[in-house]
Regions:
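Short N-terminal mixed-charge amphipathic segments
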Residues: 1-51
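Generic secondary-structure microfeatures
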Residues: 14-16, 56, 60
Length: 134
């Protein structure tokens, strides 16, 4: 996925290390299971900068790299993301950004094959249960 931030084009790619060490999957799952609209909006606003930062690690760690276990270093990079998003959101939509980032994570990362296999298993299980109850 390509994204232009402050006039510079970046490639977003969710690599294994950055995704796992920052516990992105749990945070995305929490977003998708929010109880109400206000809670979902709050979680989306909190997740956007971190999701963007993690997606930038694969190809742009020279500019946005950080040690996920060093809170001060991560917070410094998060501050950059907040500033970038302030500018980005003047002309773009937060919901679309989050949807595109999550789609990139699901469709074009190391997870995509695993997710497709899991969906296939689920469909087979449902089909078997449906057939068994007839």
């Amino acid at each position: 996925m390509k994204i232009t931030l402050n006039g510079t084009e970046y490639t977003i790619k969710f690599g294994y290390e950055a995704t796992v060490k920052n516990k992105i999957l749990k945070k995305v799952a929490d977003l998708e299971t929010s109880a109400d609209d206000l809670e979902a909006l709050d979680k989306m606003l909190m997740l956007a900068p971190e999701l963007l930062l993690v997606g930038l690690q694969k190809f742009h760690s020279d500019t946005f790299g950080f040690d996920p276990y060093n809170e001060a270093e991560k917070e410094q990079r998060m501050e950059q993301m907040y500033a970038i998003l302030d500018d980005y959101l003047e002309e773009n939509d937060m919901t679309s950004l989050i949807q595109n980032l999550i789609k990139e994570l699901e469709d074009n990362s190391f997870l995509s094959r695993m997710l497709r296999q899991e969906q296939s298993k689920t469909k087979k299980t449902v089909a078997m249960k449906t057939t068994a109850t007839k």
